[in-house]
Amino acid sequence: QYDAKGVGLGPGPMGLMGPRGPPGATGPPGSPGFQGPPGEPGEPGQTGPAGSRGPAGPPGKAGEDGHPGKPGRPGERGVVGPQGARGFPGTPGLPGFKGIRGHNGLDGLKGQPGAPGVKGEPGAPGENGTPGQIGARGLPGERGRVGGPGPAGARGSDGSVGPVGPAGPIGSAGPPGFPGAPGPKGEIGPVGNPGPSGPAGPRGEAGLPGVSGPVGPPGNPGANGLAGAKGAAGLPGVAGAPGLPGPRGIPGPVGAAGATGARGIVGEPGPAGSKGESGSKGEPGSAGPQGPPGPSGEEGKRGPNGEAGSAGPAGPPGLRGGPGSRGLPGADGRAGVMGPPGSRGASGPAGVRGPSGDSGRPGEPGVMGPRGLPGSPGNVGPAGKEGPAGLPGIDGRPGPIGPAGARGEPGNIGFPGPKGPAGDPGKNGDKGHAGLAGPRGAPGPDGNNGAQGPPGLQGVQGGKGEQGPAGPPGFQGLPGPSGTAGEAGKPGERGIPGEFGLPGPAGPRGERGPPGQSGAAGPTGPIGSRGPSGPPGPDGNKGEPGVVGAPGTAGPSGPVGLPGERGAAGIPGGKGEKGETGLRGDTGNTGRDGARGAPGAVGAPGPAGATGDRGEAGPAGSAGPAGPRGSPGERGEVGPAGPNGFAGPAGAAGQAGAKGERGTKGPKGENGPVGPTGPVGAAGPAGPNGPPGPAGSRGDGGPPGATGFPGAAGRTGPPGPAGITGPPGPPGAAGKEGLRGPRGDQGPVGRTGETGASGPPGFAGEKGSSGEPGTAGPPGAPGPQGILGPPGILGLPGSRGERGLPGVAGAVGEPGPLGIAGPPGARGPPGAVGSPGVNGAPGEAGRDGNPGSDGPPGRDGLPGHKGERGYPGNAGPVGTAGAPGPQGPLGPAGKHGNRGEPGPAGSVGPVGAVGPRGPSGPQGARGDKGEAGDKGPRGLPGFKGHNGLQGLPGLAGQHGDQGSPGSVGPAGPRGPAGPSGPVGKDGRPGHAGAVGPAGVRGSQGSQGPSGPPGPPGPPGPPGPSGGGYDFGYDGDFYRA
């Protein structure tokens, strides 16, 4: 046994390898040799047949409903136009025709929709189901014969290796020596058949919802959706007290004076008594034709004021009293009380997203053929050629590790087996016990990366947290009062027209203001009997809404009629269907990201292979175009961080996806053992920002329809991406301006595309042989592969000697200085971003998360010009909502592709330095439109205001928890191999670096010289079993 403490002056020259001793009993499986640098990704193998899917775990508990988002601020109440002053009472002279009731004043502009309530945080996703058990790792294939390491010459004080004597009999195992330098990697035994997948473990409980990240900047507000159909008009609210009648528009010419109502009984024309005082001549509502001045009888007693000319026919509808300045908003006819937006029903628990099918669990790599049981370390033969590894015996104490044999060429990475069909999401079976890792075959030369093995099972996606109830839609601005009892509200367009709200009862007519003084009536001829009131003059055309005349001075308002009682609030119309939201251009179909399955548990990272010399970083592939912004999926639970993949240079930032709702943070995956820190890869240059997508043009505003009673506002779905706003249509006749519906909830910002679970940490530099960690679990699914930057130069991992039995972990040697990382290879153009994998079936649409906090409401667009208020025409037919302008093309926010099947996990390269994060791309298009709330009846669209200025984007939300990795894009071209750095001393295992996107695999650098074997460490405890499977095929190394 070595004196581990001997001060070696350095390894003596390596003794000649003696003849291969008889196969010693296999030592415990050596730690798997470092995986050779991953070959360039081969075509993704098809995933092997999906292992049998474990039974589906029980659905995670549905996340609790997220807290209901705060209700968005109610939009400001549209400005209620001042209620037009009640026109002067018509001269009571001949009572003018009873004025036609002017149209209800225009409703004030719709208040801005309240900001959508903050979306409640998504309920916690159901806990990740326990990952189904990874099928038991098949018995490790036999470990290639590990030659018995020749005894290392005794480490002389000068460390010179004495001649290797013949291997004496193995003495009783001394304390485990430090693991010797890894011997050549034995050949990987044949891959055993894949063991059956264990049953999926029960689905874990949904992790608590991650904290919502700050709300991302609100995406650009989507074009205003067409106003949702206004909910059915609630029953008209009680007509608010009749707003003061708008200033009586200038009385149009008095309609032909109807026959003057019987003016109070005109006294018989007495002798033309003194002409009654000529009242001031009211504006002659053309006081009906003065009767021929009869003898000016007394101006008959001014009969009771004729009805206030029933407000005269409102003279011809006076100029539409400037829109009676929208009478005080009648109590919004309580906008039918918007039934409280039903809280967005808690989105039913997103059914627990059934466990996402394990992305069909990548068919488990066939179970590595049984790794033979680790034999006890064979007798240490002379460190002659390594004798064939004896059959693995039971782990004996590691015999002294002989000098590391040359590292065999890394076997080619086998192709991943075909991806099997995704099994139904089973419960993740419990992690099977890691089979004994068979000796890792020597890494073959870097093959091209085989197709990345299937990503680790994506954990069952936690159930999407229930969408918190949507905050109630901002209150719809109060409907302007129904002016005097409005004519029956025109049916809101297209909503289901609520039934016309019952016209609120007209408020009692204000008492007739004292009739304006009658103009001096010429001597009133005998007042002819009041002819039948002429029909109210036809409503003048609804002029362009005249400029709202300044409200005439209000004649003394007749006492305001008592406000009609507020009609019962109309029953809130059922939430009318939300008027169609203008056609929101199609949002790119990003289906809502299916709930992110919880990233499957990342298998424990396999032991970090020795970090080979860093190959030169290959040029980073060019950044692929940012895919269209996916709709914000819910933020999937953060999967456990997989081992760090190579940090590629930061890819060009794609356009930022819409901020997804913050998914609940998935449970933190178990930390894999920290692999030794690999050399820091050069940071790749940040990718360029993707160009912002063009703003869509604004669609034409349709002519405003008549305002129906505002139904309860349906939930506005999140605004779709702004369509191109078409040029505003000519203002329609000003319908009453419907109240501005509340701004729909701001759709959740699409979730930042889930960052895939971090890829497995790159191989840390070779740790002095450490005890053999258990087999590495399958690397977590790599995060979406960033544009692969060049991986740090991956040196060939020095040959890893056979892993001694895991001795007790020897003290970690000082980390050797990192080899000088070769300069990062020029960043190759980022490899094309892989096409998004086939979209997996969209996960259940996550329920809308709680509405994100409202971004500040965009400033209201300038209100469309109010048309001049025309005389109130008869309510014109409800204008059809103008067709929404064509939705402009979404800017290229790429959609998040549906989460492709996670690409096969790339081999873990050394952890490159995390490249700087590329600047965030422009905010991607807003995620998919949330489910439209119930359409309220569609209010007639008011003039379409210009789109308000886009609200400032809210803070960008934190990245959603890492979602399952997107498909790994094709690896960028492999950079040239960098020079091998000097072999560093065994570093202490560094913390796993942040997982960068897997970089393009650099070419394998030359293998650095093997460092001298370190003294064998005490056997380390077996590492956690990972789910990785090493398969060798004839030495080719395939790591699933």
Swiss-Prot record:
Residues 1-228, 244-1040 are annotated as: Disordered. Residues 20-31, 1010-1024 have a biased composition (Pro residues). The keyword Metal-binding does not apply. It is found in: Secreted, Extracellular space, Extracellular matrix. Keywords: Collagen, Extinct organism protein, Extracellular matrix, Glycoprotein, Hydroxylation, Pyrrolidone carboxylic acid, Repeat, Secreted. Residues 43-61, 154-175, 251-289, 340-356, 391-410, 434-458, 514-532, 544-560, 590-631, 640-658, 671-686, 706-716, 784-842, 872-884, 902-922, 991-1009 have a biased composition (Low complexity). The modification 5-hydroxylysine is found at residue 98. One of its GO terms (biological process) is extracellular matrix organization. GO terms for molecular function: extracellular matrix structural constituent conferring tensile strength. The modification Allysine is found at residue 5. Forms the fibrils of tendon, ligaments and bones. In bones, the fibrils are mineralized with calcium hydroxyapatite. The modification Pyrrolidone carboxylic acid is found at residue 1. Glycans are attached at residue 98. Residues 62-76, 659-668, 926-937 have a biased composition (Basic and acidic residues). Coiled coil: none annotated. Trimers of one alpha 2(I) and two alpha 1(I) chains. Interacts (via C-terminus) with TMEM131 (via PapD-L domain); the interaction is direct and is involved in assembly and TRAPPIII ER-to-Golgi transport complex-dependent secretion of collagen. Belongs to the fibrillar collagen family. This is Collagen alpha-2(I) chain.
